[in-house]
């Protein structure tokens, strides 16, 4: 078995067939040679894939979200993805804070999950969202077409190909720690690559399991200490279980 065979095997499985092939190949390439056999390599890759995607997206939740949208229930759809469910009660407060200076016309939503639906509810005219699971796009895109809403979904791994789109604001919710765990230095590199003058960056203050001791302080120290000089922190606030930074590019 070589990497191509392993890639084909993983993408043929029901659990991972909707994943971005670039993500699967990246992880297989990183794991190749670390294990005694190709079988162990594939098992290790599957474990990592579950950690970055499986805990957030299931076929059942996507099916239920699509049904909720068909019934016109956007809030129920948002409740069916782990990240948007966590912030649902604070959604208005969150976006009142993010849009306090101005309401953007075009938003880039990086590793978007189902969050673009919240932007639709806020009346954002144009949204470009990317994620590593095609099922998310398959849920949101038909809804956007029905509503004649300018939404584009890209199946894209930002560690393999940074977004080339331009916008007024980028949302990077709870993503940077995951990127940094995958590749050291990639989190700040992503911010530098984005073609928007302003960004909203968030960090979890608790894990999905509810543990949160020291998380907020640790993430704040890491982010504020490592943010490149070309950025300025405009504001920050803890809302619900997220620490939110509003930053802008200088010059």
From Swiss-Prot:
It holds the Pfam family FmrO. It is an enzyme of class 2 (transferase). S-adenosyl-L-methionine binds at residues 56, 81-83, 87, 111, 131, 157-158, 173, 182. InterPro entries: rRNA_MeTrfase, rRNA_MeTrfase_GmN_bac, SAM-dependent_MTases_sf. Its EC number is 2.1.1.179. GO terms for molecular function: rRNA methyltransferase activity. Keywords: Antibiotic resistance, Methyltransferase, Plasmid, rRNA processing, S-adenosyl-L-methionine, Transferase. It catalyses: guanosine(1405) in 16S rRNA + S-adenosyl-L-methionine = N(7)-methylguanosine(1405) in 16S rRNA + S-adenosyl-L-homocysteine. One of its GO terms (biological process) is response to antibiotic. SUPFAM superfamilies: S-adenosyl-L-methionine-dependent methyltransferases. Belongs to the methyltransferase superfamily. Aminoglycoside resistance family. Specifically methylates the N(7) position of guanine 1405 in 16S rRNA. Confers resistance to various aminoglycosides, including kanamycin, tobramycin, amikacin, arbekacin, gentamicin, sisomicin and isepamicin. This is 16S rRNA (guanine(1405)-N(7))-methyltransferase. It comes from Serratia marcescens. The lineage of its organism: Bacteria, Pseudomonadati, Pseudomonadota, Gammaproteobacteria, Enterobacterales.
């Amino acid at each position: 078995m070589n990497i191509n065979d392993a890639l084909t095997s993983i993408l043929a499985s029901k659990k991972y067939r909707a994943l971005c092939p670039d993500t699967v190949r990246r992880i297989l390439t990183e794991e190749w040679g670390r294990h005694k056999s190709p079988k162990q390599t594939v098992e290790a890759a599957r474990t990592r894939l579950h950690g970055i995607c499986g805990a957030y997206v299931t076929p059942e939740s996507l099916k239920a979200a699509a049904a909720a949208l068909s019934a016109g229930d956007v809030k129920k759809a948002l409740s069916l993805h782990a990240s948007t469910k966590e912030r649902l009660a604070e959604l208005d407060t969150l976006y009142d804070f993010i849009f306090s200076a101005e309401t953007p016309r075009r938003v880039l939503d990086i590793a978007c999950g189902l969050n673009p639906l919240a932007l639709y509810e806020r009346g954002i005219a144009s949204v470009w969202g990317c994620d590593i699971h095609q099922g998310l796009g398959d849920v949101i895109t038909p809804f956007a077409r029905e509503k004649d809403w300018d939404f584009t979904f890209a199946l894209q791994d930002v560690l393999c190909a940074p977004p080339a789109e331009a916008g007024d604001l980028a949302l990077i919710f709870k993503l940077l720690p995951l990127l940094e765990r995958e590749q050291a230095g990639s989190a700040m590199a992503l911010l530098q690559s984005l073609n928007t003058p302003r960004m909203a960056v968030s960090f979890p203050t608790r894990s999905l399991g509810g543990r949160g001791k020291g998380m907020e302080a640790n993430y704040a120290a890491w982010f504020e200490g490592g943010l490149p000089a070309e950025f300025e922190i405009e504001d920050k606030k803890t809302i619900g279980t997220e620490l939110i930074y509003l930053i802008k590019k200088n010059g």
